[in-house]
């Protein structure tokens, strides 16, 4: 089959031409998009930290890991939609592509409503299980309940953007997020400073921004004249495609959810040091998040490029995609990670002027930013395998290497040498162990996946 031709200037041909140049063209808008999504929460934190006090700062920041646990399963499933859509698009299978798009968007609506209900009814209980201090739990609960009311918009944007990424379009989702980000920032200032709504104000601003980005991405799909055109009358669940989406997406979502559960345990350990350490972790974790968004863009590129080339049987190009992604991810992580630590005090002052909070934040940054290139390596090998449709074994190994190591560390080593330093050394240790497991897995699975591709190539 012949791949579907590009329909507009926003799409990228992933199956021909220079790989590195196209990876950069694909990754940069996606990187900025990820940073802007984090900026929604960062602006919330900056505004409440500056204008509502340290308790409000701790309240908003302490919800991050818990929100990720609730949402990452469904966001992971969107990766399955991305992989399947990329494969069908590259192979020129327009009917299958269209049905995949409508199945994915329908599932996004359903999952968004489910998450809104979960957040509304279970937020406080989950925060209590985390040991959230009494002086911030009411504010944390209020923030989470309002935030989760926007889950349908959040899910629709992410699934719509996953479809656009599948065809190489990362520029328009970036434009949509810029618009939403400006709205978010303006509403934060208005609702918190002018109307004194505190954490409720920043949550309302975030939900409004999510609604705007959702409308824009759906409009983009609706206006398309390609096989990924959206028609609301065609929304349905096709079991065959939902099953294939789940095959890749559910393991990815479970992996992300379980890893974030380990971060919830880590948040609980930080909570035991009091509100100063909580605020320091909140600020440092936001900087840490920007680094992850940057290298995760390369992982997303690896998955999309691999999936399209798998769809047309170009196994040699799949290998080159992984190598170029490793080079690009390492370069980005070393530059941004080193910069984040060198300018750490200045970056932390964006969130707070409290010297004790900044000191805690710097201690955390030392063990998470300088070694962050390891996190990129850890994600790229399973990202490549997911592009080939193989997701279960990488998920199991990631859970064993990352979560298993951190649980042993938190409950075994940390109580004996109780300090923030010892707590956060668990990050690079878990990354190294997981890399070793994932490389071994990649070598074996690659042989199995490539065998029929090589036979098909030899027969031509």
Feature locations, PLM:
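Short alpha-helical transmembrane segments in multi-pass integral membrane proteins
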Residues: 1-27, 85-150, 194-250, 306-371, ...
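Residue-level signal for short hydrophobic patches within transmembrane helices
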Residues: 16, 20-39, 43, 66-73, ...
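Transmembrane helical elements of multi-pass membrane transporters/channels
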Residues: 25-44, 146, 180, 209-213, ...
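Hydrophobic alpha-helical transmembrane segments in multi-pass membrane proteins
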Residues: 26, 30-38, 75, 107-116, ...
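Helix-terminus/linker motif at the lipid-water interface of multi-pass membrane proteins
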Residues: 35, 39-58, 127-134, 190-197, ...
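Small-residue-rich hydrophobic transmembrane alpha-helices
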Residues: 57-117, 154-173, 280-338, 342-344, ...
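Hydrophobic transmembrane alpha-helices of multi-pass small-molecule transporters
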Residues: 69-72, 184-188, 214-218, 290-293, ...
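Short runs within selected transmembrane alpha-helices of multi-pass transporters and secretion channels
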Residues: 78, 147-165, 173-181, 202-215, ...
């Amino acid at each position: 089959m012949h791949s579907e031709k590009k329909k507009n200037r926003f799409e990228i041909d992933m199956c021909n031409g220079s790989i590195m140049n196209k990876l950069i063209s694909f990754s940069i808008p996606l990187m900025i998009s990820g940073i802007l999504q984090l900026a929604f929460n960062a602006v919330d934190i900056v505004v409440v930290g500056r204008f509502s006090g340290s308790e409000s700062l701790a309240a908003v920041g302490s919800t991050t890991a818990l929100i990720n646990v609730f949402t990452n399963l469904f966001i992971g499933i969107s990766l399955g939609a991305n992989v399947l859509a990329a494969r069908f698009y590259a192979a020129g299978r327009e009917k299958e592509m269209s049905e995949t798009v409508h199945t994915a968007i329908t599932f996004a609506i359903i999952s968004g409503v489910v998450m809104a209900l979960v957040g509304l009814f279970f937020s406080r209980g989950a925060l209590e299980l985390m040991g959230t201090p009494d002086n911030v739990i009411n504010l944390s609960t209020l923030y989470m309940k309002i935030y989760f009311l926007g889950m349908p918009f959040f899910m629709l944007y992410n699934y719509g953007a996953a479809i656009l990424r599948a065809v190489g379009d990362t520029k328009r989702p970036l434009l949509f997020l810029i618009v939403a980000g400006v709205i978010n920032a303006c509403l934060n200032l208005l609702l918190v400073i002018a109307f004194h709504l505190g954490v409720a104000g920043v949550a309302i601003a975030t939900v409004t921004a999510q609604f705007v980005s959702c409308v824009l991405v759906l409009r983009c799909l609706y206006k398309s004249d390609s096989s990924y055109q959206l028609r609301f009358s065609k929304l349905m669940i096709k079991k065959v495609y939902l099953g294939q989406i789940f095959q890749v997406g559910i393991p990815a979502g479970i992996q992300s959810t379980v890893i974030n559960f380990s971060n919830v345990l880590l948040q609980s350990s930080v909570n035991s040091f009091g509100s100063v350490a909580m605020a320091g972790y909140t600020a440092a974790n936001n900087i840490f998040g920007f680094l992850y968004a940057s290298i995760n863009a390369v992982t997303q590129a690896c998955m999309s490029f691999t999936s399209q080339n798998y769809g047309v049987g170009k196994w040699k190009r799949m290998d080159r995609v992984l190598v170029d992604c490793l080079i690009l991810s390492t370069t980005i992580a070393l530059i941004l990670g080193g910069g984040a630590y060198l300018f750490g005090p200045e970056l932390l002052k964006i969130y707070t002027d409290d010297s004790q909070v900044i000191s805690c934040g710097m201690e955390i940054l030392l063990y998470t930013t300088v070694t962050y290139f390891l996190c990129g390596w850890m994600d790229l090998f399973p990202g490549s395998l997911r592009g080939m449709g193989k997701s279960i074994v990488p998920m199991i190994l990631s859970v064993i290497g990352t979560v298993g190591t951190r649980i042993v560390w938190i409950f075994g080593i940390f109580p004996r040498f109780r300090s923030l330093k010892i707590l956060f050394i668990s990050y690079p240790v878990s990354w190294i162990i997981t890399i070793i497991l994932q490389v071994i897995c990649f070598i074996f699975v690659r042989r199995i996946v490539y065998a029929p591709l090589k036979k098909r190539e030899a027969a031509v």
